[in-house]
Amino acid sequence: MAKIVNFYPVGIQTFSNIREGKYLYIDKTQYIVDFREKKMKYVFLSRPRRFGKSLFASTLQAYFEGRKELFEGLAIADYEKEWVKHPVLHFDLSGAKHFDADALNSYLNLQLLPYEKLYGKGEGEFYPNERLDGIVKRAYEQTGEKAVVIIDEYDAPLLDVVHEKENLQPLRRIMQNFYSPLKKLDPYLEFTFITGITKFSQLSIFSELNNLDNISMFDQYSAICGISKKELTTQMKPDIEALGEDLDMTYEECLAELTRFYDGYHFSEKSEDVFNPFSLVKALNAREIAPYWFGSGTPSYLIKTLQKYHVNVMDIEKKSCDVDDFDVSPEMMTSALPLLYQSGYLTIKKYNPMLHRYTLEYPNREVKIGMLKSLAPNYLSPISLDNNSLVGDFLEKLYDADVEGAMVRLKAYLASISNRLSNKSERDFQTVFYLIFNLMGAYMRVEEDSAIGRADAVVYMPDAVFVFELKYDGSAEEAIRQIDEKGYLIPYFADGKRLFKIGVNYDSNLRTISDWKIKEE
């Protein structure tokens, strides 16, 4: 195994621990310089979970605490000369999930207590907003420096109940009450930084704080969290080479695979490509390219959102929306798109400046396969989808160019779930095929679109390419004819591989595949 060059901070989100432990730190302090030069005072940042928000918040805390020694060699070291020590109040709300009103009030109490021990508690300060107000004022009076307030994951207490009006309202009132002093505390505040997954106006809990700079979709801040291609290919290049050596890949091949799995996030109109930092760090540390981010937990609010809007798995990607669609309250939402985007399951792939519309797609292979696996049981159960079942068997037979055996396996599978699929529409069968072929993409390259036409599925193997066309109550011969007439094979002639055309017909009365036709060019 090739020697790893950097120490990666897996699971570490505290800036001081990373710097003192000599872990790799991707320098983001130039963004703090930008805040200070522009005299920004109230900043809001929305990013998906596990995307580096907490680390950036911790970096800000260390900076405003004047911990100069931690920033040696970083961009801000050349900018900052004074290193003033400000009182910093850092509230982490990520632990306030699945709470009722009493539990949330208790959690806020625990967040406030350490600062009351430092700066005292005034008589008559009982409610969280009164206590926050008093802490900030006393911190300023006792230190002579304005306070800094950092609120990390501000929306965590609300996301799981975002579609439950009776539960959302009391929790939202508590959080509105907690944040309410911030505007009138302006004379005592040096800087305020708030992070979350949703945009603040969506949960309408900052109604009084109308001077927030929402930088979430600004081009210049697109890589404030996450890892850019430049950062990856400079600071992490030696470990990409080492990973490639372990996986019998060249540097270029390894970089391409990392890109396919973890890149592709765009947070603005002209955003540079951004890699998921959680998955990238896990992959380089574990020396294996695998799905990590989706496996770290699918939020319950996402599943509830998909269920509420009856989202079909085929309808998730390549959606077009207005910029205003990202900025609606939960009560007014008409689709799952805003939460899918802000949660990191979809990202911006195109922007039409004439129409001011965005096209959203899955950012990368990791997210797409993870999402499909999560939703597959709704369509494909009771058969499990692992290497030993349908997808694995199907791929093994295609790998051996045993197309006949692969089709026999697929027919048997569809027959096994025929009762589940009885009286369903053509679209339901298309969904089943869509899931099966896209789940193959977890192991092999699967393509749907070409410049010439759109085959139902194209599966690449080391020595062969398989082009599938599916018909519903038609004929396999008709499917083969469409492959020929539309020229679906043309893009693959130059590959020098064996080329197979497979026409498949599904019979709605039999509720399984009735016939198929295989032709090799």
Which residue ranges define each predicted feature?
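Phosphate-binding site recognition
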Residues: 1-425, 440
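Conserved catalytic cores of phosphodiester-cleaving nucleases, focusing on short active-site segments
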Residues: 433, 455-472, 486
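Active-site metal-binding core of divalent-cation-utilizing nuclease and nuclease-like domains
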Residues: 138-143, 436-462
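Structural motif
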Residues: 148, 464-466, 500
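Domain-level recognition of nuclease-like catalytic cores that cleave nucleotide substrates
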Residues: 491, 497-521
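Mg2+/Mn2+-dependent nuclease catalytic core
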Residues: 169-173, 472-489
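Metal-dependent nuclease catalytic cores in nucleic-acid-processing enzymes
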Residues: 178-185, 338-346, 434-439, 483-502
